[in-house]
Amino acid sequence: YYPFGADAAGPTLTERAVGLIRRRRGPPKGVFDRTRWDEATERVQGAYRNEGYIYARVAPVVERRRFGADSQPVVDLRWQIEERQPAIINRIDIAGNDYTSDECIRRQLSIVPGDVFNQDRLLRSWQSIGNLNFFETPLPFPDTKPANDEGDLDITFRVKEKRTGSINFGASMGGAGIGVGGFIGVDQPNLFGLCKRGSLNWNFGRWVNDFNLTYQDPAINKSRVSGTVSAYRTLSRYNIANFGQNTRTGASTRLGLPVPWLSYWTTLGVSY
């Protein structure tokens, strides 16, 4: 069953394709515009590709008549469409990910094996993988090739790993009782190649000692629930009137819960 067949509820694929044309503003009524006709043909072809009909043939036909009823030149426009079989996604492969796990990358996909091929969702998946910022850019466009005689497709996403972590550190020395101070910062947005993030920040010196540790998981237990845990300890010393020191220790958590009735990517954040 496919939602674009003759038995499906709602408008047919052809009706929706024609609707794309009618929504576009064009030249004055009754005036033929070759550029807009070509654009309309491209949109019809795109509509078929997004429903899996990548082998469909859309041939624009322009028939010129010498004169119409009002003695004006007239053209008749139509498309000759051969739909053929829709393409089903047979297999999806990931290549070149020497460090990042397949599971991490596949979570970015809007298509899965068994789906009817959809060009827009393929493009969205490709962009989502690039937005991870774990791979060199520009990211090659996915390879598609026939999988069998029925015209089903195998899709391959190719990536090339790049360095993602960072380490920052520094030190300073001051006189008049200030002493030695410094900072260390470590951040890895692709911890263990699992798309999890870990960061550590430490500022230290005679009068201050701040420590912060954060861990983020975008898919807790392989679910669509994300989470962040942070722990911190802050110590400040005062040398005015023997005020002593102030120490604060704490932690925070945040959960991102999916809201599927709004959209697949929408989440609701809950913090404590």
How should each PLM-predicted stretch be described?
Residues 1-132, 136-154, 159, 164, ...:
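Interaction-mediating elements
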Residues 10-19, 57, 99, 115-272:
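Gram-negative/organellar outer-membrane beta-barrel architecture
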